[in-house]
Amino acid sequence: MAPPPAVVAHPLSSQATGLDMVHEFNQKLTKSDEHTWESFKFAPIRESTVSRAMTRRYFEDLDKYAESDVVIIGAGSCGLSAAYVLAKSRPDLKIAIVEAGVAPGGGAWLGGQLFSAMVMRKPAEQFLEEIGVPYEDEGDYVVVKHAALFTSTLMSQVLKFPNVKLFNATAVEDLITRKDAQGNLRIAGVVTNWTLVSMHHDDQSCMDPNTINAPIIISTTGHDGPFGAFSVKRLVSMNAIEKLGGMRGLDMGLAEDAIVKRTREIVPGLVVGGMELSEVDGANRMGPTFGAMALSGVKAAETVLEVFDTRKKQNQE
């Protein structure tokens, strides 16, 4: 049985307090006219109802997205920006986002050195305007008062799209590959597992993964780290690319332009964006400025749209 359609609750009025709303609900539930918190009562529920509500929907999503149109690895600022553009441009596409962390957002919850404000160089403010994030205009750059405002807004916008599913606390352990008639490698999906399982392959055995097929993947896993630069490191180990360039030292002026310009399909079926690119090309790191992450995601989405029909046809062969 399909879950019921989502219901959006609207406040009683701009002056309504939490107690007013509780009172209205309690009148419906208990027929009580008491206007106090002491009369408050939740609707009844059984524990198994909660379990079934969660598990049924999750396994329906696993079934639905086992064949996806696009898989995005990494739900940082670049991956979420790509998901937003794709979902808005092509509501017919099934888009699965796979994020190793419990909390999506990557490093975009704070600015540099755990400070609050987020800096973006122009013209990245156009993306802020698109998703409805207010900012202070400082001439050549803009400042969002707290990085979490950008990340939470972008995340909520993405998750509202009916054609997007976020699988967080889920790691990509490998890439699904195919070869064409000429023997050239093409990426055709991802191999997944619970992140906590992925972290314990050294001390536990026989923990096989799951898979998601898709004609094209966007990898935005960040610079080198435990889960970072995953896809491009895997390409090296399977001899699909010769070696990584290695991220260079910090140069904001060079780094942001390079990341956006070089966002591309590295091998057929795999588009790479964000700081993962710096490991491929030997680009500079950019430090605590976030415009390139957002716009690299936008370009990654546009790149997918350009090649999607071709990759989908190949995926059916």
Swiss-Prot record:
Substrate binds at residues 78, 99-100, 107, 172, 208, 223, 275, 285-287. It is found in: Cytoplasm; Nucleus. It comes from Yarrowia lipolytica (strain CLIB 122 / E 150). InterPro entries: FAD/NAD-bd_sf, Sti35, Thi4_fam. This is Thiamine thiazole synthase. Its EC number is 2.4.2.60. Belongs to the THI4 family. Its cofactor is Fe cation. SUPFAM superfamilies: FAD/NAD(P)-binding domain (SSF51905). It holds the Pfam family Thi4. Binds 1 Fe cation per subunit. During the catalytic reaction, a sulfide is transferred from Cys-206 to a reaction intermediate, generating a dehydroalanine residue. The gene is THI4.
